[in-house]
From Swiss-Prot:
Catalysed reactions, as listed in the record: acetophenone + hydrogencarbonate + 2 ATP + H2O = 3-oxo-3-phenylpropanoate + 2 ADP + 2 phosphate + 2 H(+)
Protein name: Acetophenone carboxylase gamma subunit
Cellular compartment(s): Cytoplasm
Pfam families: Hydant_A_C (PF19278), Hydant_A_N (PF05378), Hydantoinase_A (PF01968)
Predominant place of localization: cytoplasm
Cofactor annotation comment: Divalent metal cations. Magnesium or manganese are required for activity.
GN (gene name): apc3
A Gene Ontology term for the protein's cellular component: cytosol
Alphabetically ordered keywords of this record: ATP-binding, Cytoplasm, Ligase, Nucleotide-binding
Induction: By ethylbenzene, toluene and acetophenone.
EC number(s) from the headed UniProt entry: 6.4.1.8
GO MF annotations, alphabetized: 5-oxoprolinase (ATP-hydrolyzing) activity; ATP binding; ligase activity
Function according to Swiss-Prot or TrEMBL: Catalyzes the carboxylation of acetophenone to form 3-oxo-3-phenylpropanoate (benzoylacetate) in the anaerobic catabolism of ethylbenzene. Also carboxylates propiophenone at the same rate and 4-acetyl-pyridine at lower rates.
Family per record: Belongs to the HyuA family.
């Protein structure tokens, strides 16, 4: 795999499996080619190979001719979430410390609302806690105890372990999770339990079971979250092995022998068969976020809102100072809080497939969060769908051309879309069909714009300081409505498959976390009292583990860069801030000061300088080692300006309805692929691309820059609103 890190161009395939479409990006001989296929939920490997076939068609190669030329495949998938939602996992047994058998059943107070939609949270009185993934009779305690310092308080009773293990096996357990108190401080007991399981049920026994140790999955504090992370990994391990194994077998049968990497929600990629299931959740949106950060840096945009409008959801995240700074430390997967640090993206149930309906009162229109998916899909797909969606509204409004949708490979039935909107929306509300379609579009745009406003304002930023990267199949179609106060929106030629394109520039990244609580700055005195030896020993242990894993994957250790991130907080506060340490080791008070200053700067940006609390001291909670092995990245193309006239891309005119004027208009239509750098189009206009449509409303202007990107801006921008300081906004 070391060949992937050299500076020579590599050929790659990047695939992102979404709820509605499977996106494909092929980088071959330095050029990019994109394709899109419907997702096949019953067997994701079918959609995977369909996408590869569609990509091969772009370069005139069959799958068997294309795959042997590929060096690397990167994959982001929803397979883990699909299996979890369908509860397709084995019966799991849990061995935990005696007296703590009910910890994951009790959960945390927030578990009543974890994973619930806003409407469900408002009606919490009728909500039930989620059914556990492990039955109560398959959770047994063993006699042992390690304290918070890692010292053995009660030795492990090995005979008790053997007895409890046999009980679990007799009750039908087909996978074992071992999660003991404070095992991340001292994993000796967990390791010995695994040895006992292997002694009792050897690899060649029919009763052999996989074993997941919590300290191996998450070496961090948090009993409930650490245990649930291990449980999810054990629950999904076998089904993911089968699904991904089936895809791998098909790839090898068709001649592929390169690297197969999985996109991680931590912002990198790693060997697919060495990836914990919990690291695959939300991989697609994270790839889009990383792609946004990369292109923001290359194009000179400091602050970017990454907005991904797919068929099922709208994912939004921020790039600040050309980098990703926001993480979620205890994300909720389905209904369970886990202890996996993910790059933070916010998801709302708004997308091209979002279903519109009139509520029970008959007076209010709702759009989302339910989605029609790819099967049966929107009504206009003519595949049996009966409920109108956002895509149906876009077709009725005249924005999407039914004859050229999906590159002309999926003709749309406009008449059925009109009928569904008329009968299900317009008639119940007592309005015209076209008004109903415009209302559907308005509501979904406002839902997405509100998500952006919340994310920007709640972090103390000003929308006018940002640029919107609009991507996903429906992103360019709706960007004018969702950008709000953001002055500029950018559309990439690969916008419909941007998450897959984002993964094409992702490095190989391994992350290692270790909880070690230390006093960094003494309360009251503001003196640095961090234990240098303990600090450096923790870092060195993680570095050595990283080097061993890099060698085992065939990667050159000399190619890797090591970065340290620290989870720190002020005394008397509860909010941890993950900061990038300027140093790997601390050897002097001057080193400690440099680390603290970096923490104070990032803390102030995140929470406001008004809540910096040096007298309360500073505490270090967790170490994170980020190991990056860079991969080759294709250059961003640059074209000479060709003038403002877009007539070479003109396709003709077609009627479209514009709510801004409340009239139909013969609207100029252009072909995106034929536009040249420097071309300018004033709205109203429609720009068709192979896999998406750019809508340019009245009083908006679309221009093509020197990189072939489409830039949407207001012709007469509104005067800027009165600003409040970022600090004040953060407090509000």
């Amino acid at each position: 795999m070391s060949s992937l890190t050299n500076q020579d161009a590599i050929n790659s395939i990047d695939i992102d499996v979404g709820g509605t479409f499977t996106d494909f990006v092929l980088t071959l001989d330095g050029e990019r080619h994109i394709a899109k296929c419907p997702t096949t939920p019953h067997d994701l490997s079918i959609g995977f190979l369909n996408a590869v076939e569609a990509g091969g068609d772009k370069v005139g190669l069959s799958v068997e001719e294309l795959l042997p030329r590929i060096d690397i495949i990167r994959y982001s998938t929803t397979v883990a979430l699909n299996r979890l939602l369908q509860r397709q996992g084995p019966r799991i047994g849990l061995l935990t410390t005696e007296g703590h058998e009910d910890a994951i059943l009790i959960g945390r107070g927030a578990q009543w609302t974890d994973g619930q939609r806003v409407a469900e949270r408002r009606n919490i009185a009728v909500q039930n806690k989620p059914l556990p993934l492990i039955e109560r009779d398959l959770i047994l305690g063993v006699r042992e105890r390690i304290d918070s310092s890692g010292s053995v308080v009660r030795p492990l009773d090995e005979e008790d372990v053997r007895t409890k293990l046999r009980m679990l096996m007799d009750r039908g357990a087909r996978a074992i999770v071992v999660s003991l108190l404070w095992s991340f401080m001292n994993p000796a007991h967990e390791k010995r339990v695994r040895e006992i399981i292997r002694e009792e049920y050897k690899e060649y026994h029919i009763g052999f079971v996989p074993v997941v140790m919590s300290h191996s999955v998450v070496s961090k504090i948090g009993e409930y979250e650490r245990t649930m992370t291990a449980v999810l990994d054990a629950y999904l391990q076998r089904s993911m092995q089968n699904d991904i194994g089936a895809t791998w077998d098909k790839l090898r049968a068709k001649g592929y022998h390169g690297a197969f990497l999985m996109i991680h929600n931590s912002g990198g990629s790693a060997d697919i068969f060495k990836t914990p299931a919990s690291r695959t959740f939300n991989g697609g949106p994270v790839a889009g976020l990383m792609g946004s950060a990369y292109f923001a840096n290359k194009l000179g945009y400091k602050n970017v809102v990454a907005g991904d409008v797919g068929g099922t959801s709208f994912d939004v995240a921020l790039v600040v100072e050309s980098s990703v700074r926001n993480y979620t430390f205890r994300p909720v997967i389905d209904k369970w809080m886990v202890n996996v640090t993910m790059m933070q993206t916010i998801s709302v149930g708004s997308g091209g497939g979002s279903i519109a309906k009139v509520d029970r009162s008959g007076t209010r229109l709702e759009v989302g969060p339910r989605s029609a998916g790819s099967m049966p899909g929107p009504v206009c797909y003519d595949l049996g769908g009966t409920e109108p969606t956002v895509t149906d509204a876009d077709v009725v409004l005249g924005y999407i051309n039914p004859d050229t949708y999906y590159g002309g490979r999926m003709p749309l039935n406009k008449a059925k879309a009109e009928k569904a909107i008329r009968e299900k929306i317009a008639q119940p509300l007592g309005i015209e069909t076209i008004e109903a379609a415009a209302l559907i579009r308005y509501i979904v745009d406002e839902n997405m714009a509100s998500a952006i406003k919340r994310e920007v304002h709640m972090r103390g930023y000003h929308p006018e300081d940002f640029v919107l990267f609009a991507f996903g199949g429906a992103g360019p179609t709706h960007m004018a409505g969702l950008k709000g106060d953001i002055p500029k929106a950018v559309v990439f030629p690969a916008a419909p498959v941007f998450c897959a394109m984002g993964s094409s520039i992702m490095d190989i990244v391994h992350m290692y976390e270790q909880s070690r609580r230390m006093v960094f700055m003494e309360p009251g005195t503001e003196k640095f009292v961090v234990d240098y030896e303990h600090f450096n020993q923790t870092v060195d242990t993680m570095i050595e583990r990283a080097r061993q894993e890099l060698r085992s994957e065939g990667l050159e250790v000399d190619d890797a860069s090591f970065g340290l991130e620290l989870d720190m907080l002020y005394g008397g506060q509860v909010n941890l801030k993950r900061m990038s340490s300027p140093l790997l080791h601390i050897r002097t008070a001057e080193d400690a000061l440099k680390v603290y200053q970096a923490f104070e700067t990032e803390f102030s940006e995140a929470f406001s300088p008004l809540v910096v609390n040096k007298p309360g001291g500073v505490f270090l909670d967790n170490f994170v080692l980020r190991v990056t092995v860079p991969t080759w990245k294709p250059p961003i193309p640059e074209y000479p300006l060709q003038g403002t006239d877009p007539s070479a891309a003109f396709l003709g005119k077609r009627k479209a309805y514009w709510p801004e004027t409340k009239h139909w208009a013969d609207t100029p239509t252009y072909q995106f692929e034929l536009l040249q750098a420097g071309n300018v189009i004033d709205g109203p206009a429609i720009v068709e691309a192979e896999l998406t449509t750019i809508v340019v409303p009245p009083r908006q202007r679309l221009s093509i820059d020197t990189h072939g990107l489409a830039i949407l801006e207001a012709i007469d921008p509104a005067p800027p609103t009165k600003r409040v300081s970022a600090a004040a906004a953060a407090i509000v």
